[in-house]
Amino acid sequence: MKIAIFSGGEFLKTQLLPYDKLICADKGYEYAKALNLTPDFILGDFDSLGYMPQSAEIFPKDKNFSDTELAIKKAVSLGATEIDIYFSLGGRLDHELFNINLLKYAKNLGVTANIISGNTVVSLISGNGSYLAKKGNNVSLVPFSDEAHIIKSKGLKYPLDNIKAVRGETLTLSNVATCDEIYIEIASGEVLLICFL
């Protein structure tokens, strides 16, 4: 099951992908209303939204997890196999960085998660797979582990064949997609794949 989460970052014009259920975290409810969408679940402490929507699951402001993390937990409890998190970039830098790190949290729970904001898609990847891109647009791979060994790629202007992407270095910044689907094979480590669609 694919679940969409609306977070409370910057509200950018974004193409929504098909989903089975929608969870709104705090201010994400405002974005759902702006898009004339009815969420299946609403949760959070609502410090950003400023009021408590009807039928919302309400949590205290003094808690040890963010509203977006709560939404991921909820999605997993509902049986999600994939999660797309919208509107979680922009705004406060600390929230933005933690939202990106929540991709690892979802992965640890056995769920594939992506952040989608405007024309930007961020995914935490390892192993091998094919990914949506846009011909002519930038693709970057940011090392998430200390080192990632990329053994093969297809669909990139600058092939990533048998290279080591090291955290803190910029070797894999600003590649270019040569087609609308790219393939990346990683022998070890993890990278944040950032595609601009």
Task: Report each predicted region and the residues it spans.
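Short phosphate-binding loop-to-helix
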Residues: 57-78
